[in-house]
């Protein structure tokens, strides 16, 4: 079974080392390198082979660890818009590109230093000078790494933040549940999911999103509860929170807005309608279905008020599953089910994998 976390393009980036950690790692690997040489070989030739091999091993390990930072980091320009928007909010996409480019630009400098010092070792007939050349090369390469240390540190921090994002399959239709706290969103997600929903971090909220999967007919669907996101008036949000919310427009093929007409959730019916209007303004293109939950405990006069306000509303009892089948079927019908560009397997294959 696919773990949702795997669908986050940043979740499987290998461990990235700091500049000092790369230097230490490469040094330890190169000094442990064992050499085999003929006893009949002259000392100067044995030294030449040893120093060249140690330098090459040092450079090899440095490049491997640099590639973990650069080549294994997802291409920003190829990200799904949902992740692209969140990456911009959390770390800044231009800053990521700049830091990755700065680290990558170190590699030709390292190659140039390596070639020059290997050539010096090959031409030398003094075993002490060979050792000095190898140490000089390591010193210059270490200096290059230290000069780009801030870029490596930024990439490490970016990976830490972005790897926590929820795993969303961009090629599977997504239903996002909205509404005030305690209206029954998480109950709906848990009751319709075919497996235990996964819980994931979402930026600028103190609570976690709940992601479930289900099948409606022959269609696989993601359903997402958004506690702390679409559950309070927009006037209470700062600019960055609003930007994080608008990222959902790239995720939500359809929104189910749940209203508790019984007001047992702690919010009046009118307050819930006001929030609905705000969500409709923020997501003018996304289809929004309105569901009245807890109709079994709603006083008749309050239920009639809600019905009069929303003639085409869905009436459900999420805790019992009543009315959910029609709601979900119609939600999926609202989704544009054009052929997806890639299958889940293709998408997973495009993500970086830790080879360690």
Across the structure, where does each feature detected by a protein language model lie?
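Conserved glycine(s) of the Walker
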Residues: 183-184, 323
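N-terminal accessory targeting/assembly segments
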Residues: 1-106
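Switch II of P-loop NTPase G domains
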Residues: 40-54, 72-93, 227-251, 262-278
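Pre-Walker A adenine-sensing motif
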Residues: 157-168
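Switch I (effector-binding) loop of TRAFAC-class P-loop GTPase G-domains
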Residues: 167-170, 192-222, 226-246, 269, ...
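Canonical P-loop GTPase G-domain recognition
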Residues: 285-289, 296-354
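Charged, amphipathic alpha-helical linker segments immediately N-terminal to NTP-binding catalytic cores
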Residues: 100-156
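Conserved C-terminal guanine-recognition region of P-loop GTPase G domains, centered on the G4
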Residues: 160, 240-315
């Amino acid at each position: 079974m696919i773990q949702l976390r795997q669908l986050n393009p940043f979740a499987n980036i290998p461990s990235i080392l700091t500049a000092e950690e790369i230097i230490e790692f490469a040094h330890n690997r190169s000094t442990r390198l064992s050499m085999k040489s003929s006893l009949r070989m002259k000392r100067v030739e044995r030294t030449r082979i040893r120093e060249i091999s140690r330098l090459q091993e040092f450079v090899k390990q440095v490049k491997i660890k640099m590639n973990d930072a650069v080549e294994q980091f997802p291409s920003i320009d190829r990200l799904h818009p949902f992740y692209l928007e969140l990456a911009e909010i959390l770390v800044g996409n231009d800053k990521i590109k700049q830091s990755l480019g700065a680290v990558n630009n170190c590699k030709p400098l390292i190659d140039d230093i390596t070639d020059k010092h290997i050539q010096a070792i090959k031409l030398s007939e003094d075993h002490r000078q060979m050792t000095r050349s190898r140490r000089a090369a390591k010193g210059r390469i270490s200096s290059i790494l230290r000069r780009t240390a801030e870029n490596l540190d930024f990439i490490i921090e970016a990976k830490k933040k972005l790897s926590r994002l929820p795993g969303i399959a961009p090629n599977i239709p997504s239903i996002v549940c909205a509404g005030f706290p305690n209206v029954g969103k998480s109950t709906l997600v848990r009751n319709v999911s075919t497996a235990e929903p996964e819980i994931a971090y979402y930026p600028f909220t103190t609570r976690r999103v709940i992601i479930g999967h289900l099948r409606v007919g022959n269609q696989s669907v993601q359903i997402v509860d958004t506690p702390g996101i679409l559950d309070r008036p927009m006037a209470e949000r700062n600019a960055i929170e609003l930007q994080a919310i608008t990222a959902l427009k790239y995720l939500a093929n359809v929104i189910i807005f749940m209203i508790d007409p019984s007001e047992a959730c702690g919010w009046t019916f009118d307050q819930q309608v006001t929030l609905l209007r705000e969500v409709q303004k923020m997501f003018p293109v996304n289809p929004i279905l309105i569901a009245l939950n807890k109709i079994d405990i709603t006083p008749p006069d309050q239920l009639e008020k809600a019905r009069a306000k929303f003639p085409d509303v869905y009436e459900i009892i999420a805790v019992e599953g009543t009315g959910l089948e029609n709601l979900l079927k119609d939600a999926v019908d609202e989704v544009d089910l054009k052929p997806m560009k890639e299958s889940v397997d293709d998408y997973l294959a495009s993500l970086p994998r830790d080879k360690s």
